């Protein structure tokens, strides 16, 4: 029965946390490169 609740836990995790980490990583890379 626990597996029935996993999607409702992973969907916000993937849709909110992963993009936040990706944007933070890209921001650090851009700041490190100093292209702007």
From Swiss-Prot:
It is found in: Plastid, Chloroplast thylakoid membrane. One of its GO terms (biological process) is photosynthesis. The keyword Chloroplast applies. It comes from the Eukaryota. Belongs to the PsaI family. PANTHER family: PHOTOSYSTEM I REACTION CENTER SUBUNIT VIII, PTHR35775. This is Photosystem I reaction center subunit VIII. The gene is psaI.
